[in-house]
A protein has these predicted regions:
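Hydrophobic helix-coil surface modules that form long, contiguous segments used
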Residues: 1-99, 128-131, 140, 161-165
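Catalytic Zn2+-binding segment of zinc metalloproteases
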Residues: 102-117, 132, 136-137
């Protein structure tokens, strides 16, 4: 656990949690440290203090989503609690995921899309901002190299499949929503933001 002092002076309690059986492997201090690096970055970028009273990260088993934001609390697949020595690429991916979910506190939770048609905007922007935050606030200053060789490449591969779709897809029902949580919505959408900023 830890805390962060917001730009508006509030003390924001932070927690990082996992199953008791994983505690010997859990580097919760590093999770909190990455989060503390991202908080002031997002408060400055969004020109808005952290909008909730606390921030918890709960590492959970058998979680299909990978990670999911909720106001003041994020759930993350406990594969990110490393049981053996991880590659630095995996440690970097965890940092990006932590900062992706933190970005959603402002863009996704404080401000929420009206309907799932704008899923792409929610996820693409969080993916883009998490790489900006990683590159500018953490030791992974080459996060965009990783993005271009990983997420962007994955999106390009998915875009060549018969199941490709526009970044801004028409969402009629829950099934449409679920099939759009993919590399096109995340990686291709973030690539478009990257291009717009560079332009």
């Amino acid at each position: 656990t830890g805390s962060y002092t917001s730009v508006d002076g509030r003390n924001i309690p932070m927690g990082a949690y996992c199953r008791r059986s994983l505690l010997p492997y859990f580097d919760g201090d590093e999770v909190i440290n990455i989060t503390k690096q991202g908080m002031p970055f997002y408060e400055t970028q969004y020109k808005q203090p952290y909008p909730f009273r606390k921030y918890d990260q709960i590492f959970v088993p058998e979680y299909n989503m990978g990670a999911m934001e909720h106001p003041g609390c994020v759930t993350i697949l406990d594969d990110y609690v490393f049981r053996s020595k991880p590659t630095q690429a995996l440690v970097e991916r965890r940092a990006i995921t932590i900062l992706h979910e933190l970005a959603h506190m402002w863009f996704g939770d404080l401000v929420t899309m009206k309907w799932w048609n704008d899923l792409w905007l929610n996820e693409s922007f969080a993916e883009y901002m998490s790489h900006v935050a990683t590159a500018e606030t953490t030791r992974w200053t080459d996060a965009w190299v990783t993005f271009n060789s990983s997420e962007k490449l994955h999106a390009q591969r998915q875009d060549q499949l018969p199941s490709t779709h526009p970044i801004a897809a028409v969402i009629n029902d829950l099934e449409d929503t679920m099939v759009n949580f993919d590399g096109i919505t995340y990686g291709k959408g973030a690539s478009v933001f990257q291009q717009l900023v560079a332009y």
